[in-house]
């Protein structure tokens, strides 16, 4: 167990598997919880006693060992250690995972830490982790190189084989062609021979035939032919002709012709045969060449294919690189190409493997640093992000592989309990269901792996295990959320931490406590300011242990047990003892919502009958309580220290002033005001008017005798001074022996009675006393009695006897509070008495309707009819008609209100209530007696139909309907506003919670100028704004130069009066905005604590006060403005609460104003229906040259020249002189004896003004503006203002803008509260160039830390970092705080914790929230004093033991261990605190009053 005071800081980091195992008391292997029959935990299950400890104190599981005497024994039978059952809240178990799983925070966070570290996109990382893709985790370069060579050789061989095949085919083709051609040659020859032979045969036949015919003819020569003689178709001799020699000649001719024809035919046939053969040869050759080409192409394409294939496969081989993501197909292909060259895997195991093998943080950091310095744009941005993660791991000592879990811790069973319900069923924490899923899947996976199941089944089981662990850590972060029975989403470990119901906000920052109760409140008019009425029954229950102890002490009971019985039976003696006990005790009363510190105050309890708590009427304002059914809670501070603190700091009579404004918060109101107003009224003509009395006593005697009315004006002689103006004549007669004036005063008996109730220094006030007057009396009383100058030493001695020996300032404050409280009580009693005596009440007849009302309405209706007529005639637009009518009715309502006011009887009860500000105002009265007027519709637009009736007359149905809009809107707005205001308060608290006054003076020379000219803008007096500040520079009389006050002097009331008299318009004051304290704020910069009227004390939690002061009135702010027109105009800017949020979140405002970007002159331009505003900045540079006597200009006046042009040269040829040359381009100006070149540099910035935008006041053509000045109306964007005008301008702007909103709603808040918040918004700087620091570009650093680090670097001769001021909204600022506990308990818990764990963040517990979370005394108020005392004690011890040294050295020798322990204590105390007195430390009621709050679970449940 942690000893609560033994540490000064808390560190969060990643847990290694060894850490998890070292925490664990055993492995949970079964998903079972408890046995349904025995209802005892199952062995090795989620509630196993052997692992987590026994369920009953000092008793083992099997019952072998019972009682405390066996403490520490481990049962040999069931293995359970005999110890207390509360160890089940502390002891953890573990689950050994069959396969590593990733921690979802580091995978799915933005940015993904795992992804950044490995340079893998979140999408790819997710695909690997959830078994959708492979990742290469190892590459064997040697095998890869061998495989490359083998591939190249294989393809080389393939190429050669194909080429060889192609060559052999070529040879084949050539041989075939040769053969074919040879065959054709021989065929041709045989054809020729055949033709030759054929024709030879034919010739022989013809010749033979001719020979035969010749022979015949020769034989028959001279004879006549018997028939036609024919030769080859030609008739030689016709029948009957004689055969002659000619006939033979003709035959010879015919024979020759025939043979010649035959020869020709032969030649032709031979030619044909030859041609045929040639064609065939050509065909064959062509076919062969085509075949060869085809073969070549095939070869080439095959070779190309091989080259491509080889290239692809080599590329695939080269693509085998670490971290490459592969899908199933790619993985298979690569495995074929390069078996053994790489190893790819899926899931968290693969990622872990990759981290262990490849991530060398030092080397990676070096590479990334180089990249950051050498690249630009997106690459630099990414490198910076990665470097941030790498540096976080390096500095924190975390190992990246710890982001992957191999062992899963199981939280103690009592933190995830299982309880039996009435019906015998069990209710269990969702965590048990989630753990059960993990265990089931893990066991199934182990079994599958043992069985060597197919890869796909194992893979699926691993994915399911990963999803189960994800659901356990953060259900719903990825994919669909796991839901239990009844479809509700199971609450995971992350859900246990985050949100309003999470561990931080529900159990650590606010706990339900014992010794508390609540009841309805009723008014207690007879109580003193510091008292409350506590019902007896309630008190008895609250103080039960104290009563029991006193009963035993008095002997009324023998022991605690019998005392308890007596109390429970409520015997009569119990009440006396209770009276005795309660006498010394204070109780705390609290009314929710606790919007500021005055919502919890301490009171002395006064026992009363009944069941309601009685509350003093004057503290109602602080609690914002009324008696219409409000409830309040009562708490009892237990320890002496708590009682003392409640008495000195929380008692209601010491909380008279509001911490937000410094005004009294216990101002009398309502009946009291009415009573005092009635008492101090003058009624002319009342009984006894005008009588004269020699003294006050004489006048009172006359009143007692009934001779004078209480309100009758009378004349009284009296001695003394008047306070303030008198509303009746005063005549100074003379002075008494002490110099006090004697006067004759016109006053009333009522005023005499009233003044008699005032303390001596506050008399005599001779005027009508309303609410404001009573507030002044309370304020004056407090100021008078807390001013040490007004107290004598005798007074101080009296005070010392009451409060002990304390600082004089404290004594004055306590005494002033005491006197003011008693004065307030006297006024309260008087007010109630005369409110009763006066009998003021309200009846229907008191509401009198003014006769002028009908006239006003008739006149308004007449004017409206005229406007309508003009509209119908087309003289005015719809918009103008609407505006006119609204204005007419608003004026009518105003006139009616005036008439009501005039017609009112000033002595009537209604008028008295309104005029005294006791209740109600004239507008409400006007609605009752005048007219209700105009109403808004649901959109906020004013309905032009007025409600002419009032409540006295009653509304018509239509009027009632119209008025419901406004009513409903009011209610809806209020509901929305309350939630918004609450959230704003929470953000403000978070951003400012570590702002505590830590030192006296930070020593800064900087401050803040407060100008009288700002008064109009922020609606507050200059004097009011400087009051309570400390001067940052001496204040000087502007006329004489006399120093009125030195630097660091407080501006008190006297000095503000002096400033007003001398007309001083600006004062340079210390401000939280300029404070340079390393942690918190210094007293000088903060100035006066408004709640005490004195300089703030060290330890005051000014941040919390500021946040409460701004947040508490938030509900009063209207939600949004209603504009009168239908169309939004540029002045329809956000107001009220949304505007406050806009300011504090540093958002771009709605209706943003255009600002001048540079100093210059305005030009208004209109181009193509577009309005442009141009700002032109002109800079003139002049280059003058003196002209020597013999020089003449060579350029004309007004000429344009360039740099290097000749301007003048010598007119004497005998002199060898240089010409005068222009040193810059520009226009020439020639003067007497000199020549100048004037260069004009123009810079132009142009913006387009929207049509709706209206120009800001004073913006016209030729107007001179400065950078950051408004060109159009609207709110400036604070980020733009910061860039243009710098830090101071934006600070002033934010403070003034916030004040405008609050003041316009009549809410007073002191500037310094807003300044505290604005300071937090501007605390950070963004690193631009890191120089020699170890910062990273873009990192957000605390400005004081930045300055300190740079100073160190400069002192070592290094190059400092550069940075720009950042303006962060309060939400962002809260999340960038140095304390991870504060940030995690605010918002985005998982993101904050993820970041903090990786960086190994250390929380030095400097703020309030972090100390509350871990249950330590807060470093504020009395906590800070306790710290200092203890630190001084330890320093004293150290001074006696060791020489002082700043270095903390690791001591190895045993004799130094004691010194080191002392050092540790000192460190713990200086940076932390002590827990104060706990119940029982004083030995008062240690046995009888165990504190039964849930405090002992805080360590385990973080």
Swiss-Prot record:
CDD domains: RNAP_beta'_C (cd02655), RNAP_beta'_N (cd01609). GO terms for molecular function: DNA binding; DNA-directed RNA polymerase activity; magnesium ion binding; zinc ion binding. InterPro entries: DNA-dir_RpoC_beta_prime (IPR045867), DNA-dir_RpoC_beta_prime_bact (IPR012754), RNA_pol_asu (IPR000722), RNA_pol_N (IPR006592), RNA_pol_Rpb1_1 (IPR007080), RNA_pol_Rpb1_3 (IPR007066), RNA_pol_Rpb1_3_sf (IPR042102), RNA_pol_Rpb1_4 (IPR007083). Its cofactor is Mg(2+); Zn(2+). Keywords: DNA-directed RNA polymerase, Magnesium, Metal-binding, Nucleotidyltransferase, Transcription, Transferase, Zinc. SUPFAM superfamilies: beta and beta-prime subunits of DNA dependent RNA-polymerase (SSF64484). GO terms for cellular component: DNA-directed RNA polymerase complex. HAMAP family: RNApol_bact_RpoC (MF_01322). This is DNA-directed RNA polymerase subunit beta'. It comes from Roseiflexus castenholzii (strain DSM 13941 / HLO8).
């Amino acid at each position: 167990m942690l000893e609560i005071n033994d540490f000064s800081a808390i560190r969060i980091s990643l847990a290694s598997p060894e850490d998890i195992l070292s925490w664990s008391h055993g492995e949970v292997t079964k998903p079972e919880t408890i046995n349904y029959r025995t209802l005892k935990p199952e062995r090795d299950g989620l509630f196993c006693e052997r692992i987590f400890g026994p369920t009953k104190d000092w008793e083992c599981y099997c019952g072998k060992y019972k009682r405390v005497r066996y403490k520490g024994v481990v049962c040999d039978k069931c293995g359970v250690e005999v110890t207390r059952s509360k160890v089940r809240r502390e002891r953890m178990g573990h689950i050994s995972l069959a396969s590593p799983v990733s921690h979802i925070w580091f995978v799915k966070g933005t940015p993904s830490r795992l992804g950044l570290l490995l340079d893998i996109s979140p999408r790819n990382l997710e695909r690997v982790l959830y078994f959708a893709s492979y990742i290469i985790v190892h590459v064997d370069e040697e095998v890869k190189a061998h495989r490359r060579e083998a591939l190249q050789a294989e393809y080389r061989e393939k190429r050669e084989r194909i080429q060889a095949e192609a060559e052999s085919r070529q040879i084949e083709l050539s041989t075939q062609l040769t053969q074919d051609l040879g065959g054709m040659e021989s065929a041709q020859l045989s054809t020729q021979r055949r033709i030759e032979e054929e024709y030879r045969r034919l010739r022989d036949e013809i010749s033979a035939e001719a020979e035969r015919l010749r022979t015949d003819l020769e034989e028959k020569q001279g004879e006549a032919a018997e028939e036609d003689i024919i030769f080859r178709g030609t008739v030689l001799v016709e029948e009957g002709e004689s055969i002659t020699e000619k006939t033979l000649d003709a035959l010879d001719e015919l024979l020759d012709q025939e043979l010649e024809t035959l020869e020709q035919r032969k030649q032709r046939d031979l030619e044909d045969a030859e041609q045929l053969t040639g064609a065939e040869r050509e065909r064959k050759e062509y076919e062969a060449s085509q075949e060869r080409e085809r073969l070549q192409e095939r070869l080439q394409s095959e070779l190309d294919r091989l080259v491509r294939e080889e290239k692809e496969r080599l590329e695939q081989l080269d693509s085998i690189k670490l971290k490459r993501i592969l899908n199933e197909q790619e993985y298979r292909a690569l495995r074929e190409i390069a078996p053994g060259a790489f190893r790819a895997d899926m899931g968290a195991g693969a990622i872990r493997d990759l981290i262990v093998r490849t991530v060398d943080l030092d080397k990676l950091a070096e590479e990334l640093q180089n990249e950051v310095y050498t690249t630009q744009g997106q690459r630099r941005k990414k490198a910076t992000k990665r470097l941030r993660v790498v540096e976080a791991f390096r500095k924190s000592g975390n190992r990246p592989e710890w982001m992957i879990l191999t062992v899963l811790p199981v939280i103690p069973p009592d933190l995830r309990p299982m309880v039996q319900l009435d019906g015998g069923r069990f209710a269990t924490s969702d965590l048990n269901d989630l753990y059960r899923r993990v265990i089931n899947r893990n066991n199934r996976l182990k079994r599958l792996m043992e069985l060597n199941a197919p890869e796909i089944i194992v893979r699926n089981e691993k994915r399911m295990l990963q999803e189960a662990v994800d659901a356990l850590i953060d259900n719903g972060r990825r994919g669909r959320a796991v839901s239990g029975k009844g479809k509700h989403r199971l609450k995971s470990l992350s859900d246990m931490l985050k949100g309003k119901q999470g561990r931080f906000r529900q159990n650590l920052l606010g706990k339900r406590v014992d010794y508390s109760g609540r009841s309805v409140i009723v008014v207690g008019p007879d109580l003193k300011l510091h008292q409350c009425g506590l019902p007896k029954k309630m008190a008895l229950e609250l103080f039960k242990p104290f009563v029991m102890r006193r009963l035993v002490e008095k002997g009324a009971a023998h022991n605690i047990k019998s005392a308890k019985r007596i109390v429970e039976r409520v015997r009569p003696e119990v009440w006396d003892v209770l009276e005795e006990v309660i006498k010394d005790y204070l109780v705390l009363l609290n009314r929710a919502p606790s919007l500021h510190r005055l919502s919890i105050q301490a009171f002395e309890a006064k026992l009363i009958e009944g069941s309601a708590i009685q509350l003093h009427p004057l503290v109602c304002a602080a609690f914002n309580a009324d008696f219409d059914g409000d409830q309040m809670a009562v708490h009892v501070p237990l320890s002496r220290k708590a009682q003392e603190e409640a008495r000195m700091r929380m008692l209601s009579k010491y909380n008279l002033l509001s911490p937000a404004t410094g005004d009294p918060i216990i101002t009398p109101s309502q009946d009291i005001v009415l009573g005092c107003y009635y008492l101090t009224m003058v009624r002319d003509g009342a009984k006894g008017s005008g009588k004269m009395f020699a003294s006050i006593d004489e006048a009172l005697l006359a009143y007692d005798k009934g001779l004078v009315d209480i309100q009758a004006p009378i004349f009284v002689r009296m001695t003394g001074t008047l306070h303030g103006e008198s509303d009746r004549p005063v005549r100074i007669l003379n002075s008494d022996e002490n110099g006090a004036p004697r006067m004759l005063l016109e006053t009333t008996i009522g005023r005499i009675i009233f003044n008699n109730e005032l303390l001596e220094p506050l008399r005599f006030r001779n005027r009508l006393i309303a609410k404001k007057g009573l507030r002044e009396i309370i304020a004056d009383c407090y100021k008078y009695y807390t001013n040490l100058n007004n107290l004598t030493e005798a007074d101080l001695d009296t005070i010392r006897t009451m409060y002990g020996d304390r600082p004089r300032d404290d004594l004055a404050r306590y005494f002033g509070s005491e006197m003011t409280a008693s004065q307030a009580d006297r006024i309260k009693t008087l007010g109630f008495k005369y409110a009763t005596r006066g009998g003021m009440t309200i009846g229907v007849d008191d509401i009198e309707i003014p006769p002028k009302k009908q006239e006003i309405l008739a006149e308004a209706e007449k004017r409206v009819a005229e406007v309508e007529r003009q509209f119908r005639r087309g003289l005015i637009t719809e918009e103008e008609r609407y505006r006119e009518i609204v204005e007419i009715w608003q004026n009518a309502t105003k006139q009616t209100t005036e008439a009501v006011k005039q017609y009112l009887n000033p002595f009537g009860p209604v008028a008295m209530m309104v005029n005294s500000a006791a209740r109600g105002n004239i507008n409400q009265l006007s609605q009752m007696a005048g007219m209700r007027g105009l109403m808004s519709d649901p959109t906020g637009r004013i309905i032009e139909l007025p409600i002419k009736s009032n409540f006295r007359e009653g509304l018509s149905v239509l009027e009632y309907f119209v008025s419901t809009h406004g009513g409903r809107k009011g209610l809806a707005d209020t509901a929305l506003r309350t939630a918004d205001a609450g959230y704003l308060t929470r953000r403000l608290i978070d951003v400012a919670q570590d702002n505590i006054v830590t030192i006296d003076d930070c020593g800064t020379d900087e401050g803040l100028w407060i100008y009288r000219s700002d008064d109009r803008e922020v609606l507050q007096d200059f004097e009011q704004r400087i009051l309570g500040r400390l001067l940052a520079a001496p204040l000087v009389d502007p006329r004489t130069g006399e120093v009125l006050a030195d630097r660091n002097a407080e501006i008190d009331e006297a000095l503000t009066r002096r400033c007003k008299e001398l007309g001083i318009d600006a004062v340079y004051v210390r401000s939280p905005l300029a404070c340079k304290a390393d942690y918190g704020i210094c007293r000088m910069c903060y100035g006066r604590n408004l709640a005490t009227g004195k300089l703030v004390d060290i330890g005051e939690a000014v941040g919390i006060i500021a946040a409460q002061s701004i947040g508490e009135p938030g509900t009063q702010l209207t939600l949004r403005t209603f504009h009168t027109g239908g169309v939004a105009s540029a002045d329809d800017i956000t107001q009220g609460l949304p505007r406050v949020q806009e300011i504090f979140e540093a958002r771009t405002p709605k209706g943003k104003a255009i600002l001048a970007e540079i100093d210059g002159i305005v030009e208004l331009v209109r181009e193509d229906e577009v309005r442009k505003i141009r700002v032109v900045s002109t800079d003139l540079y002049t280059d003058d040259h003196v002209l020597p006597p013999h020089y003449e200009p060579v350029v004309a006046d007004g000429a344009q020249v360039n740099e290097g042009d000749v301007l003048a040269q010598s007119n004497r040829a005998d002199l060898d002189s240089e010409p005068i040359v222009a040193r810059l381009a520009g226009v020439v100006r020639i003067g007497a004896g000199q020549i100048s070149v004037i260069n004009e540099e123009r810079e132009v910035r142009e913006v387009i003004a929207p049509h709706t935008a209206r120009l800001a006041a004073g913006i016209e053509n030729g107007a001179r503006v400065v950078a950051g000045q408004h060109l159009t109306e609207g709110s400036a964007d604070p980020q733009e203002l910061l860039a243009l005008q710098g830090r101071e301008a934006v600070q002033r702007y934010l403070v003034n803008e916030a004040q405008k909103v609050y003041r316009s709603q009549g809410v007073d808040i002191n500037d310094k509260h807003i300044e505290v918040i604005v300071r937090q918004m501007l605390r950070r700087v963004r690193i631009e160039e890191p120089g020699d620091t170890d910062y990273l570009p873009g990192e957000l650093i605390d400005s004081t830390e930045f300055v300190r680090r740079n100073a160190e670097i400069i002192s070592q001769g290094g190059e400092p970092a550069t940075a720009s001021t950042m303006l962060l909204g309060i939400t962002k600022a809260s999340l960038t705080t140095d304390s991870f506990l504060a940030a995690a308990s605010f918002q985005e818990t998982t993101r904050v914790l993820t970041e903090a764990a990786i960086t190994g963040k250390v929380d030095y517990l400097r703020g309030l929230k972090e100390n509350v979370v871990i249950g330590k005394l807060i470093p504020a108020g009395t906590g800070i004093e306790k710290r200092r005392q203890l630190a001084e004690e330890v320093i004293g011890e150290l001074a006696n033991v060791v020489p002082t040294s700043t270095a903390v050295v690791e001591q190895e020798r045993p004799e130094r261990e004691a010194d080191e322990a002392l050092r540790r204590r000192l460190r713990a105390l200086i940076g932390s605190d002590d827990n104060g007195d706990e119940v029982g430390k004083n030995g008062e009621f240690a046995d009888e009053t165990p504190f039964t709050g849930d405090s002992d679970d805080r360590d385990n449940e973080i």
